[in-house]
């Protein structure tokens, strides 16, 4: 797959708030987690200087470390491994997220989606396209709320112009 095209297309789907490409780590042991996280940071950011912050979440509360410990210990590991890196908790260039569930997911990129409700979850509607800007904007806004839209345009000369028809097409 073309990674950028997938992100671009998903970024237009209503109901998606954020898209986060992740690295999946099946073995949740601390040694494996630090290795996978370090390799991920090296592959994305290399040896160039950067500031970072680590945020972690544990859905699996059986994990032996608490979220704050994971963040602090991983930050310490990354500082040792990347001498050009520094911590900035207020305005980091890189926000490294670690989510521990049955598996661990590591990511630093979060692409915003349009949000709203998934299309088709709130019924259907007809949209009358007039040739002006207000009708497609209204259609966009109602589609964002999960309504499936079918658009209709009535061409009724001499009351509607050929220009209005071309705008709709």
Regions found by a protein language model. Give the residues of each.
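RNA-binding accessory domains that recognize and position tRNA/RNA substrates
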Residues: 1-126, 140-167
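Short glycine/serine/threonine-rich phosphate/pyrophosphate-binding segments
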Residues: 134-139
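Phosphate/diphosphate-binding glycine-rich loops and adjacent basic-rich segments that engage nucleotide
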Residues: 130
């Amino acid at each position: 797959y073309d990674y950028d095209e997938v992100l671009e297309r998903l970024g237009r789907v209503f109901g998606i708030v954020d898209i986060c490409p992740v690295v999946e780590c099946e073995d949740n042991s601390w040694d494996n987690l630090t290795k996978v996280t370090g390799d991920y940071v090296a592959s994305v950011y290399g040896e160039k200087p950067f500031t970072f912050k680590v945020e972690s979440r544990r859905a699996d509360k059986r994990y032996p470390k608490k979220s704050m410990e994971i963040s602090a210990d991983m930050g310490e590991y990354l500082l040792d491994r990347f001498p050009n890196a520094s911590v900035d908790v207020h305005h980091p260039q890189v926000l490294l997220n670690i989510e521990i569930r049955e598996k661990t997911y590591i990511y630093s990129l979060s692409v915003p989606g349009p949000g709203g409700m998934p299309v088709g979850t709130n019924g259907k509607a007809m949209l009358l396209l007039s040739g002006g800007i207000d009708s497609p904007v209204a259609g966009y806004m109602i589609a964002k709320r999960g309504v499936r839209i079918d658009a209709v345009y009535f061409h009724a000369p001499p009351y509607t112009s050929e220009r209005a028809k071309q705008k709709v097409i």
